[in-house]
């Protein structure tokens, strides 16, 4: 599984071009995962996630309220 990790505010975790920052963010939630900064979305993106990992979903988006 893969997807955008969600911050405490329910939003995607923002980044600019810092892949290491995103890798740390992903591994803090899911130890075996990897991550990078998705340039077009300016958000961290995690890969190699467990099936039950909760990631950002446009249909359940709670960002900003």
Swiss-Prot record:
Q: Which Pfam families match?
A: Toxin_3
Give the keywords, sorted: Disulfide bond, Ion channel impairing toxin, Neurotoxin, Secreted, Toxin, Voltage-gated sodium channel impairing toxin
Classification via CDD domains: neurotoxins_LC_scorpion
Q: List the disulfide bonds.
A: 11-63, 15-37, 22-44, 26-46
Localization terms from the record: Secreted
Q: Tell me where on the tree of life, at the top rank, the source sits.
A: Eukaryota
GO CC term (a single one): extracellular region
A single Gene Ontology MF term assigned here is:
toxin activity
Q: Which GO terms describe its biological process?
A: defense response
Q: Which residues form the LCN-type CS-alpha/beta domain?
A: 1-64
Q: Where is the signal peptide?
A: none
Kindly state the tissue distribution recorded for this protein.
Expressed by the venom gland.
Function of the protein: Beta toxins bind voltage-independently at site-4 of sodium channels (Nav) and shift the voltage of activation toward more negative potentials thereby affecting sodium channel activation and promoting spontaneous and repetitive firing.
Family assignment from sequence similarity: Belongs to the long (4 C-C) scorpion toxin superfamily. Sodium channel inhibitor family. Beta subfamily.
Free-text domain note: Has the structural arrangement of an alpha-helix connected to antiparallel beta-sheets by disulfide bonds (CS-alpha/beta).
- Can you say what this protein is called? Putative beta-neurotoxin RjAa7
């Amino acid at each position: 599984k893969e997807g955008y990790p969600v911050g405490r505010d329910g939003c995607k975790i923002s980044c600019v071009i810092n892949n290491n920052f995103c890798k740390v963010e992903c591994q803090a939630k899911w130890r075996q995962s990897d991550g990078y900064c998705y340039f077009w979305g300016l958000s961290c993106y995690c890969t190699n996630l467990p099936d039950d990992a909760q990631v950002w979903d446009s249909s359940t988006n709670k960002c900003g309220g």
